[in-house]
Amino acid sequence: MTAQNMKLSARIPSIRSREGLVSFVGALRKDLETNRNDWENPTLEDFLEAMEAWIGSMGRFYANKGQPVPQSPTWEMFAHILHASKIYE
C-alpha cells in the first residue's frame, strides 16, 4: 500500500457526515488525477466492477475487523466501499 493510499485509508474511520464523505471523494478524485498508476481500477467500468465485487464480499472485511456488517449503510461504510473499489481485484 502506497503512502498516499495509507493516508486515504486512515481518513475513513472519522467520516461521520455527508460533508466528510464529500471531502473524502474529493481526495479520491485528486489521488486518481495525481497517482493514476497506483489505481488497480482507474476506469469507471473497472471501478464499478470492483465495487460490485467488494460489496458482495465485504462481510469478510468486517469479519477481519471483528465487527458485524452494519445493517444500515453509514457514511464510513460508503467511504470503505469507494476506497476498496480503487484497489480491489
What are these regions, as identified by a protein language model?
Residues 2-56:
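Amphipathic alpha-helical packing elements
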Residues 26, 49, 63-64, 80:
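Intrinsically disordered, low-complexity regions enriched in small/polar residues
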Residues 32-35, 58, 62, 85, ...:
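Amphipathic alpha-helical interaction segments
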Residues 50, 54-60, 64-67, 72:
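N-terminal accessory alpha/beta regions
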Residues 64-89:
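Amphipathic alpha-helical binding modules
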